[in-house]
């Protein structure tokens, strides 16, 4: 490979064979330039590459043809052309001598790299590598960006987010990238909505569909710097205006109008983006999102929390893991105070997706520079820093063309004593190419995740659309069929919930039939048991027959005519009273099940079907409730009849009852049988006695009477009793005993009870034998007590006193219950409890069966018929099928978003197979 000087020397020597010597060097040079462009090295050579290729493409074609043609005439023609082109080669190399040296030097160091095939293909297409990839991928992402703006923030697309404080030069950077003035300017907060800026590189001039309102006044000379035809090559389109084209002055005005329309006339902000597409042959394919500039102090017409609002908006955008952060910081301020870098570090602490941009490098104090920052020595960023020079306010006022500014920017960097060493890594053009390369690579890397997001969103909206259903048909026959289908489906799912055959699996709670079974097995049994086990104070929580005190049993025994046994009639009466107490809880069971059935009717499984038609839903619930309440009324009557049937026949021949009876007979027949300690209640106050005697024994705290003698009372018989009250009790006892004896003699002749089987059937029931006690063993205290009783009795007879209401029979304490009575009371209560268990079990089981048969099963059978008979009417179909407006709006939204997502998925699928995704 010859040096540049040798090339120049050879090109001036006509004796050198042009065909064999000069053209191979040109081919190598072209390959070098293409390789250089591909790697974005020596950015200053870019603008010469197309010129170089165009100048020698024709000659190369002649050269290639000459290799395949041995005709002497053609060779003579080529030699003649060679002589004519020598001058052009010399002129070109002389003008670009310095460029040529750099290019050839870079080519020498890269001879081992093999890019020949790729370079030749790029050369044939006359395109650079990055332009090809960017032009193919970015339009797809831009289209997705537009759809994402319409769909919402549900897709995390790869995009470059421009972040910076006010007056940081953010707007100037964007305008430099576009090469046009198009952003509104002014004091305070100007950018008040996100601006999605999509740059499309065009290659041909289009005169179609140009905005008819485009003005061609003197202002166009400012926006069209080169010639008047540029207005046809460059234009803008907004996402909210369709395909209408705008020139750059109109773009600025439309941004202001659209911002004020959404964000209001004051200085408030809005998160709804503006989508702007700019078509120009001068731009690099790129997508940027310009956000409002950070501010610290709210000015006039701004809300006081404007700073927090802007920060929150910026965080929402840069938190997207697929976004690239373009953090803009003015170089004439301390880098550690950069608001943009501070926010970027919050979401990207490692700096893997942050590009730092230093603006206003020309405004730094003399003797200072930002070379350490640009080289990454101060703040390390994986994507590095890029320095740029913006137009000054005077340049803007003087309408200095941006192309002239870009040339001045390059000249300033090239002549700077420090920055000239890294000129190829500075400037607006380098920033554009760097962003293009990073974004293009990022798009390729995030394609799978974006495609997966779109797939998931399609699945979600299809599911939502299925819930909202198809639009209502217009024909009457189709409407009637739809109504019938809804009623049938409603009834089917109701049956499925009760039977446990619902397709939807619920794991967080009992549902349908499982809840009903739980109510039967747990809640229902505990409720009826609590109603049957009422304590003596009628507060609940005691034992069965807790409402029946031992004193009442003693009185019942004595009222039966004997102190030794009780007739069957008294036993039956006590059992019936106990069964009557559970009648209401059993009836309430059907009401509990009714509430559960109503809950199932409005269950979430098919609530979405009814939510479409609020009138139909209301009527279905009304008809269903009426049908269920008819059933529950019949069910309650059957439950009440069942209780009456249980009370009508007290079956003392039940095997379980006989088993308990035999056990009691066996245990009580033993001579050593003793009534368990504490098996008797220590109070005579009952639910039937409104007052309690002052002589009754106190009830110990925390006592649980009659828990199978496991929790006995601690009876304190030493409780002091007033002497006068005691004397009155003794007098009452004597007179009452005489009355009882007379009644017993009469009743024993007429009645006999089941307890006679325990104590015999003689006219005088036997009492447990007790050894006679000699008189000398009786205590002197007892003798005195007997004498006092006799004296009091005689005194009462003389006074001809009668019993007052306060001397009621239930006021007798436990002291007057004999051992025989204790035994009888104990045995009687145990038999009552034994039969109560049998009766309670029968009632609970039969109640569950009646509720299942008459309410649950019957509701499954009649619900569909009731709904069709009541609602399937041709005259009311239109009214019943009137849709909820909210459902209609949501369905239309789903259809719209599904259409956008499916188009996006199609675009991604077509691009996924493109070789351009695999070139990097």
Curated annotation (Swiss-Prot):
Residues 389-392 are annotated as: G5 motif. Residues 190-192 are annotated as: G2 motif. The keyword Nucleotide-binding applies. Residues 825-916 form the GED domain. It is found in: Cytoplasm. GO terms for molecular function: GTP binding; GTPase activity; microtubule binding. Residues 359-362 are annotated as: G4 motif. Residues 164-171 are annotated as: G1 motif. Residues 154-448 form the Dynamin-type G domain. One of its GO terms (cellular component) is plasma membrane. SMART domains: DYNc, GED. Residues 765-774 have a biased composition (Pro residues). Residues 724-751 form a coiled coil. It holds the Pfam family GED. InterPro entries: Dynamin, Dynamin_GTPase, Dynamin_GTPase_CS, Dynamin_N, Dynamin_stalk, G_DYNAMIN_dom, GED, GED_dom. Residues 65-84, 204-241, 680-790 are annotated as: Disordered. Its main location: cytoplasm. Residues 681-705, 724-751, 775-790 have a biased composition (Low complexity). Residues 290-293 are annotated as: G3 motif. Keywords: Coiled coil, Cytoplasm, GTP-binding, Hydrolase, Nucleotide-binding. Belongs to the TRAFAC class dynamin-like GTPase superfamily. Dynamin/Fzo/YdjA family. PANTHER family: DYNAMIN, DYNAMIN-B. Enzyme hydrolyzing GTP. This is Dynamin-B. It comes from Dictyostelium discoideum (Social amoeba).
């Amino acid at each position: 490979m010859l040096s540049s000087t040798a090339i120049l020397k050879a090109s001036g020597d006509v004796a050198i064979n042009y065909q064999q010597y000069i053209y191979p060097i040109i081919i190598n040079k072209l390959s070098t330039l293409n390789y250089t462009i591909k790697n974005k090295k020596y950015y200053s050579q870019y603008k010469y590459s197309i010129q170089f290729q165009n100048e020698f493409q024709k000659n190369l074609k002649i050269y290639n043809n000459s290799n395949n043609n041995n005709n002497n005439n053609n060779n003579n023609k080529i030699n003649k052309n060679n002589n004519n082109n020598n001058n052009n080669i010399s002129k070109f190399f002389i003008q670009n001598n310095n460029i040529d040296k750099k290019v050839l030097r870079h080519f020498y160091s890269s001879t081992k790299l093999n890019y020949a095939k790729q370079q030749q293909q790029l050369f044939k297409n006359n395109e650079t590598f990055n332009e090809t990839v960017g032009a193919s991928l970015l339009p797809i992402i831009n289209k997705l960006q537009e759809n994402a703006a319409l769909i919402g923030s549900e897709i995390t697309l790869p995009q470059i987010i421009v972040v910076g404080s006010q007056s940081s030069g953010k707007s100037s950077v964007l305008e430099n990238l576009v090469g046009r003035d198009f952003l509104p300017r002014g004091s305070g907060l100007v950018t008040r909505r996100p601006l999605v800026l999509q740059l499309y590189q065009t290659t041909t001039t289009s005169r179609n569909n140009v905005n008819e309102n485009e003005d061609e006044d003197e202002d166009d000379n400012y926006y069209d710097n080169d010639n008047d035809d540029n207005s046809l090559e460059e234009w803008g389109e907004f996402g909210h205006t369709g395909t209408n084209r705008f020139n750059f002055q109109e773009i600025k005005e439309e941004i202001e109008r659209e911002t004020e329309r959404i964000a209001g006339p004051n200085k408030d902000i809005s998160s709804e983006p503006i989508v702007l597409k700019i078509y120009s042959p001068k731009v690099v394919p790129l997508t940027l999102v310009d956000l409002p500039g950070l501010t610290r102090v709210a000015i006039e017409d701004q809300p006081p929390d404007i700073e927090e609002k802007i920060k929150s908006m910026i965080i929402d955008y840069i938190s997207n893991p697929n976004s690239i952060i373009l953090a803009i910081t003015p170089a004439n301020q301390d880098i550690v105070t950069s608001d943009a870098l501070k926010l970027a570090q919050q979401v990207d602490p490692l700096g893997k997706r942050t590009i730092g941009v230093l603006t206003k490098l020309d405004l730094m104090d003399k003797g200072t520079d930002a070379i350490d920052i640009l080289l990454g020595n101060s703040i390390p960023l994986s994507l590095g820093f890029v320095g740029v020079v913006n137009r000054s306010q005077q340049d803007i006022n003087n309408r200095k063309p941006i192309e002239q500014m870009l040339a001045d920017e390059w000249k300033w960097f090239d002549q700077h004593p420090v920055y000239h060493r890294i000129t190829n890594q500075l400037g607006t053009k380098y920033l554009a190419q760097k962003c293009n390369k990073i974004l293009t690579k990022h798009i390729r890397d995030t394609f799978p995740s974006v495609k997966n997001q779109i797939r998931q969103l399609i699945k979600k909206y299809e599911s939502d659309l299925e819930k909202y259903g198809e639009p209502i048909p217009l024909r009457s026959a189709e409407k009637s069929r739809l109504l019938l289908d809804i009623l049938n489906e409603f009834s089917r799912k109701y049956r499925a919930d009760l039977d446990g055959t619902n397709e939807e699996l619920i794991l967080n709670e009992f549902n349908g039939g499982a809840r009903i079974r739980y109510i039967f097995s747990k809640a229902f049994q505990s409720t009826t048991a609590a109603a049957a086990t009422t304590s003596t104070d009628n507060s609940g929580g005691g034992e069965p027959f807790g409402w029946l005190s031992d004193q009442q049993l003693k009185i019942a025994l004595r009222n039966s005519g004997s102190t030794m046994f009780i007739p069957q009639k008294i036993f039956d009466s006590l059992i019936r009273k106990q069964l009557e107490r559970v009648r209401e809880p059993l009836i309430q069971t059907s009401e509990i099940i009714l509430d559960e059935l109503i809950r199932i009717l409005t269950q979430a499984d098919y609530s979405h079907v009814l939510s479409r038609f609020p009138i139909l839903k209301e009527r279905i619930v009304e008809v269903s409730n009426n049908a269920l309440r008819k059933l529950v009324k019949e069910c309650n009557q059957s439950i009440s009849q069942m209780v009456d049937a249980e009370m009508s026949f007290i079956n003392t021949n039940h095997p379980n009852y006989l088993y308990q009876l035999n056990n009691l007979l066996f245990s009580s027949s033993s001579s050593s049988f003793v009534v368990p300690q504490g098996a008797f209640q220590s109070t005579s106050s009952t639910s039937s006695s409104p007052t309690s005697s002052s002589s009754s024994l106190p009830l110990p705290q925390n006592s649980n009477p009659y828990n199978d003698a496991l929790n006995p009372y601690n009876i304190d018989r030493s409780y002091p009793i007033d002497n006068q009250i005691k004397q009155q009790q003794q007098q009452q006892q004597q007179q009452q005993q005489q009355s009882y004896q007379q009644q017993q003699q009469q009743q024993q002749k007429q009645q006999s009870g089941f307890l006679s089987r325990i104590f015999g059937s003689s006219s005088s029931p036997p009492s447990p034998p007790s050894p006679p006690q000699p008189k000398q063993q009786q205590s002197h205290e007892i003798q005195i007590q007997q004498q006092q009783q006799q004296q009091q009795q005689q005194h009462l007879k003389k006074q001809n006193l009668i019993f007052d209401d306060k001397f009621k029979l239930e006021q007798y304490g436990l002291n007057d219950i004999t051992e025989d009575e204790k035994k009888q009371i104990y045995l009687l209560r145990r038999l009552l409890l034994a039969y109560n268990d049998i009766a309670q079990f029968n009632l609970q089981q039969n109640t569950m069966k009646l509720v299942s048969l008459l309410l649950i099963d019957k509701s499954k059978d009649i619900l569909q018929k009731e709904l069709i008979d009541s609602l399937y009417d041709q005259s009311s179909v239109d009214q019943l099928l009137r849709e909820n407006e909210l459902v209609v709006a949501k369905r239309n939204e789903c259809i719209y978003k599904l259409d956008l997502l499916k188009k996006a998925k199609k675009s991604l699928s077509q691009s996924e197979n493109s070789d351009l995704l695999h070139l990097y």
